[in-house]
């Protein structure tokens, strides 16, 4: 990808990443990925495996920009940390999610099975009640699947609000 730009928004203390974005020439619109929690991808353009797959999909689907927000803004590659932390959500996370959603051409939910932790998936669905949501499929429990191990042939479908 030529002309690739990147960045992220962090809390002052560095414990939370509120958003991550990648921008490239070509395409149109912004896809917003809502996942579980930030791992190792950063503002310098370094991708972890999940962000790499999201970026490839976003380009293939014709978007010009992708942004990633998370149910939990706490930076950790381990979902277990979300259960143990006093505040895994982060004080500015809901405002960040709502602001990013307001600018998105498509919102793709992809937090996987752990999204039900602390009732967080339901809170975010309520926060975005007026927005059309999409996913790449759902788990047996009805949560949107995480994109890491899904085939690239999967395309976004409407995500219900059951």
Each language-model region and where it sits:
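Glycine/proline-rich loop-helix segments at beta-alpha junctions forming the active-site rim
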Residues: 82-162
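Short connector loops at secondary-structure junctions
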Residues: 64-80
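Short catalytic helix/loop segments, enriched in acidic residues and glycine
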Residues: 49-59
């Amino acid at each position: 990808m030529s002309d690739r730009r990147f960045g992220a928004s962090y809390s002052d203390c560095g414990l939370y990443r509120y958003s991550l974005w990648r921008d490239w020439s070509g395409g149109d619109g912004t896809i917003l990925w809502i996942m579980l929690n930030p791992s190792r991808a950063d503002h310098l353009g370094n991708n972890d495996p999940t962000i790499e797959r999201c970026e490839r999909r976003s380009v293939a689907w014709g978007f010009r920009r992708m942004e990633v927000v998370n149910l939990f803004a706490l930076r950790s590659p381990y979902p277990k940390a979300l259960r143990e932390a006093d505040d895994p959500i982060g004080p500015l996370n809901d405002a960040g999610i709502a602001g990013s959603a307001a600018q998105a051409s498509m919102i793709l939910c992809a937090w996987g099975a752990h999204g039900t932790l602390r009732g967080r998936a339901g809170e975010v669905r309520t926060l975005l009640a007026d927005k059309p949501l999409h996913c790449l499929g759902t788990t047996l429990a009805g949560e949107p699947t995480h994109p890491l191990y899904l085939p690239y042939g999967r395309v976004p479908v409407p995500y219900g609000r059951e």
